[in-house]
């Protein structure tokens, strides 16, 4: 499954995680991506969308 939003382009983010003793380990944070049927250019199409774009109404779902 895609790890990138087709609407806003949000993807995974790399960084460093710190424990209580301040030891470091590299890790990635994944966006909350959903596969939905949406209307794109007047036709229903399956796209990958983050939940923030879904909630903000940037996507019109296909019925």
From Swiss-Prot:
<dbReference type="InterPro" id="IPR026569">
    <property type="entry name" value="Ribosomal_bL28"/>
</dbReference>
<dbReference type="Pfam" id="PF00830">
    <property type="entry name" value="Ribosomal_L28"/>
</dbReference>
<dbReference type="InterPro" id="IPR034704">
    <property type="entry name" value="Ribosomal_bL28/bL31-like_sf"/>
</dbReference>
<dbReference type="GO" id="GO:0005840">
    <property type="term" value="C:ribosome"/>
</dbReference>
<keyword id="KW-0689">Ribosomal protein</keyword>
<dbReference type="GO" id="GO:0006412">
    <property type="term" value="P:translation"/>
</dbReference>
<dbReference type="InterPro" id="IPR050096">
    <property type="entry name" value="Bacterial_rp_bL28"/>
</dbReference>
<protein>
    <recommendedName>
        <fullName>Large ribosomal subunit protein bL28</fullName>
    </recommendedName>
</protein>
<dbReference type="InterPro" id="IPR001383">
    <property type="entry name" value="Ribosomal_bL28_bact-type"/>
</dbReference>
<comment type="similarity">
    <text>Belongs to the bacterial ribosomal protein bL28 family.</text>
</comment>
<dbReference type="GO" id="GO:1990904">
    <property type="term" value="C:ribonucleoprotein complex"/>
</dbReference>
<keyword id="KW-0687">Ribonucleoprotein</keyword>
<dbReference type="InterPro" id="IPR037147">
    <property type="entry name" value="Ribosomal_bL28_sf"/>
</dbReference>
<dbReference type="GO" id="GO:0003735">
    <property type="term" value="F:structural constituent of ribosome"/>
</dbReference>
């Amino acid at each position: 499954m895609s790890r990138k939003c087709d609407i806003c382009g949000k993807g995974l983010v790399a960084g460093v995680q710190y424990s209580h003793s301040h030891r470091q380990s590299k890790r990635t944070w994944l966006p909350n991506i959903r596969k939905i049927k949406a209307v794109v250019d007047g036709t229903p199409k399956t796209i990958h969308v983050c939940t923030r774009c879904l909630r903000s109404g940037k996507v019109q779902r296909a019925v």
